[in-house]
């Protein structure tokens, strides 16, 4: 949120610099993302008074002699502008000056005449008419007659200001306004807060009745409206235009500007309905009907449902509650009567409607964080005061204030100074705590027994209990008063990565070496993702923990598998034109012992890998598995297993030391056909997935490092091309080969071939064998005997022939 320094000064007598205030705000829990000086990029630009002018013959230029005070009383500068006259004061960028955008001004010749700088327009200084009148004229910016030559230009044109870009956290909706930040600044500096004027007087009766009703008080706890007649559209005063411009808004008209100004200043969204366009002069706050439509002020049409709250007239919706008004009831140059609305809408309703429709606004941003029920009264009063002050219309006596019946009461918290200090872990003087709370507009009633009855301001809905009071105290008292200490239960460590973290890092590096990139997904999805994988209802993966307040229905359960998230990432990549890739994710899944949960679920660390692309195959994923096995000095075995989402003939379960680690294989043809991707992608894509229980994998790893010397003798490799039945698995062949001799240290599959020349139901698999002996050099005879034994075992056990 952008907050001008000059606007804050209207509410608080600030006696520190903007930079000092930035530090104080940060120390009190407000993150100033950026402190923006308005004169950024401007240097050595001063007020210059034109004392001589002469047209330069044969050119469009005018030679000027400019009085720049202490910088020189007769500086010669040529300009192409024609809107100035003798005696005018204008911005003069002198030799060596800079302008916004990194523009550097140097003395140079223009059409053969020396020019020692540049006379500037408002645009060249980054100004517009809302910031300084006359800035958008074609030509030079003409300054006030009483401007003093040689004065720095910034204070003359209002560029001696700063914008605080503050990140407002979700628990402080009361700070979503200039007044809200000013309130905090007043407390920080120990200064009084000067509230904006909110007095007004009704001057006439309504010319006709208006009906206002709220059918959904659960979604609209308070709805206020006031009727104003004889609307007089016009231009806003300079101060209001400047306020809006500093916050990034352009002035439109006096009445529209008042609604925007109230939003920025008070944090209260408001809307004005043109009563001449409101059918039946009726306003009804209700849930939308199924299929009802509205066109908003930005000319977008939306189809609504009962989950959306709308403001309606006697015939149709005229506004999306808390988000944006309808185009059918907006102000224009013919508007003569307005109904001003200020309300409190349920934050969840506004958030869900905004997300569902993809429609956001400054109003919805504030309602989503929360607007307290007292805010509409203050916001409406401020707006009506401005209506009267700027003579925009005649305020009538007709006003509505509809509530859900709940009383507007301050929250009371009974506590003791000892409790607050106990939370902080330090002793803060009682009177200091009382002073801090009172500066923050809390009231503290000290009881006879020494306890405190503290009442929170109406706008502080985030304050619920005494730890919240402790937070308020320490924010103002200073976190630097808390001495760093160890927890009683804490153990001292040497720092750095622990064993588990090192193993995770090693795993990631092993996969990265195989060409895999790390993915990171949300910890929740929906049952639709499990449906997509054809997971049966009785499967343990269906025993998912439901979120009570999901961000959306698509994110309504805690994940029990990583594979659905990985498949979503792959599909998103394919939709965006990424035709190939290798990904992995290491993250927990959440497994409940029973539902509904009665204890914390087990967060089981899991590893998921995915590969997609026309050239990817089964052995891409198997190669990743083997890389993990080799990296951790393990031996994996593979067995056939049916998995709902994997191809029955191109998948396997992974085992280590008798433990089942997980599964991997090709996505089933049926699921591949159901993916929301183009048909040509479905036909050409190969998608392979694998998911391992990472905790089970790590339980197989021997954490003790042992020295294993390299053999001083050369290893020997032999390749075997074997023909076997389709039903014979790669794992069976590898296992048989390894058991033939202790000299065989490694077996790798490097090719699979199927063809008519092999015969029906046959395939060829080519393996590379590595033979090594750490104690002696292997002879050719040993190699031949070993290979012969391998082939004999393969033929006897599996019926395999050499090709």
Residue ranges: model-predicted function:
Residues 413-579, 718, 770-774, 782-803:
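Extended, well-folded interaction surfaces typified by the phenylalanyl-tRNA synthetase beta subunit core
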Residues 5, 23, 53-55, 189, ...:
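Glycine/proline-enriched, intrinsically flexible loops and inter-domain linkers
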Residues 33, 47-78, 246, 259-328:
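Conserved mixed alpha/beta core segments that line enzyme active sites in large multi-domain catalysts
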Residues 2, 20, 438-442, 462, ...:
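A carboxyl-terminal module marker
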Residues 39-43, 200-202, 455, 491-492, ...:
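Beta-rich nucleic-acid/ligand-interaction surfaces
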Residues 114-130, 135-140, 154, 162, ...:
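Mobile "lid/hinge" segments at catalytic clefts and subdomain interfaces of large enzymes
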Residues 185, 189-214, 391-420:
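Terminal amphipathic helices with adjacent charged low-complexity linkers/tails
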Residues 1-202, 206, 339, 358, ...:
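Phosphate-backbone binding interfaces of nucleic-acid-interacting proteins
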């Amino acid at each position: 949120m952008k907050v001008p320094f000059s606007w804050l000064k209207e509410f608080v007598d600030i006696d520190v610099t903007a930079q000092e205030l930035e530090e104080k705000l940060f120390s009190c829990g407000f993150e100033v993302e950026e402190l923006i000086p308005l004169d950024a990029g401007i240097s050595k630009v001063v007020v210059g008074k034109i004392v001589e002018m002469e047209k330069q013959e044969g050119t469009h230029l005018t030679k000027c002699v400019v009085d720049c005070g202490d910088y020189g009383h007769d500086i010669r500068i040529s300009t192409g502008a024609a809107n100035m006259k003798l005696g005018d004061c204008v911005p003069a960028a002198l030799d060596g000056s800079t302008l916004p955008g990194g523009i550097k001004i140097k003395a140079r010749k223009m059409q053969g005449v020396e020019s020692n700088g540049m006379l500037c327009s408002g645009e060249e200084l980054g100004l517009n008419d809302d910031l300084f009148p006359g800035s958008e004229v074609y030509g030079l910016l003409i300054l006030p007659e009483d401007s003093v030559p040689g004065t720095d230009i910034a204070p003359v044109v209002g560029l001696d200001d700063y914008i605080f870009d503050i990140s407002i956290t979700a628990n402080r909706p009361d700070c979503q306004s200039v007044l809200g930040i000013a309130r905090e600044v007043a407390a920080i500096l120990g200064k009084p807060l000067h509230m904006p004027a909110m007095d007004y007087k009704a001057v006439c009766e309504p010319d006709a009745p208006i009906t206002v009703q709220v059918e959904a008080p659960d979604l609209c706890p308070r709805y206020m409206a006031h009727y104003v007649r004889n609307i007089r559209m016009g231009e806003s005063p300079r101060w209001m235009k400047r306020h809006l411009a500093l916050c990034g808004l352009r002035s439109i008209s006096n009445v529209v500007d008042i609604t925007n100004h109230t939003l920025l200043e008070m944090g209260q969204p408001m809307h004005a309905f043109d009563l001449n366009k409101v059918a039946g002069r009726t306003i009804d706050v209700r849930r939308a009907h199924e299929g009802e439509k509205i066109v908003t002020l930005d000319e977008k049409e939306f189809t609504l449902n009962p989950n959306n709250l709308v403001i309606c007239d006697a015939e149709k919706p005229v506004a999306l509650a808390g988000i944006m008004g309808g185009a059918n009831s907006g102000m224009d140059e013919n508007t003569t009567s307005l109904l001003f609305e200020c309300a409190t809408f349920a934050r969840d309703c506004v958030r869900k409607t905004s997300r569902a429709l993809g429609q956001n606004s400054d109003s919805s941003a504030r309602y989503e964080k929360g607007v307290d029920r007292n805010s509409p009264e203050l916001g409406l009063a401020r707006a009506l005061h401005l209506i009267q002050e700027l003579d925009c219309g005649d305020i009538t006596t007709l006003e509505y204030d509809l509530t859900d019946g709940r009383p507007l009461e301050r929250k009371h918290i009974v506590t003791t100074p000892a409790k607050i200090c106990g939370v902080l872990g330090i002793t803060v003087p009682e009177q200091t705590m009382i002073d801090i709370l009172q500066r923050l507009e809390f009231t503290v009633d000290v009881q006879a027994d020494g306890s405190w009855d503290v009442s929170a301001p109406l706008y502080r809905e985030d304050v619920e209990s005494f730890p919240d009071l402790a937070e308020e105290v320490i924010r103002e008292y200073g976190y630097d008063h808390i001495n760093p200490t160890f927890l009683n239960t804490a153990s001292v460590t040497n720092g750095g990565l622990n064993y588990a973290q090192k193993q995770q890092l090693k795993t990631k590096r092993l996969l990265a070496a195989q060409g895999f990139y790390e993915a990171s997904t949300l910890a929740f999805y929906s049952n639709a993702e499990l449906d997509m994988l054809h997971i049966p209802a009785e499967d343990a993966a269906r025993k998912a923990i439901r979120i009570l307040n999901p961000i959306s229905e698509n994110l309504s359960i805690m994940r029990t598998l990583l594979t659905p998230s990985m498949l979503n990432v792959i599909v998103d990549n394919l939709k965006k034109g990424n035709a190939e890739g290798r990904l992995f994710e290491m993250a927990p899944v959440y497994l409940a012992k029973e539902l509904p949960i009665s204890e914390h679920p087990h967060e089981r660390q899991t590893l998921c890998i995915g590969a997609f692309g026309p050239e990817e195959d089964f052995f891409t994923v198997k190669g990743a598995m083997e890389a993990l096995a080799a990296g951790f000095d393990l031996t994996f075995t593979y067995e056939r297993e049916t998995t709902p989402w994997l191809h029955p003939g191109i998948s396997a379960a992974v085992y280590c030391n008798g433990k089942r680690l997980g599964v991997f294989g090709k996505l089933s043809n049926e699921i591949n056909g159901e993916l929301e991707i183009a048909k040509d992608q479905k036909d050409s894509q190969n998608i392979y997935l694998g998911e391992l229980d990472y905790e089970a994998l790590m339980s197989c790893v021997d954490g003790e490092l042992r020295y294993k010397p390299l053999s001083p003798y050369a290893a020997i490799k032999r390749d075997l091309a074997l023909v076997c039945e389709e039903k014979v698995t790669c794992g069976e062949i590898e296992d048989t080969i390894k058991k033939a001799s202790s000299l065989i240290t490694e077996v790798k599959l490097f090719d699979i071939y199927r063809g008519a020349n092999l015969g029906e139901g046959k395939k060829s698999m080519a393996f590379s064998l590595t033979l090594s002996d750490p104690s002696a050099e292997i002879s050719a005879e040993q190699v031949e005997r070993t290979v012969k034994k391998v082939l004999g075992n393969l033929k006897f056990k599996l019926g395999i022939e050499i090709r």
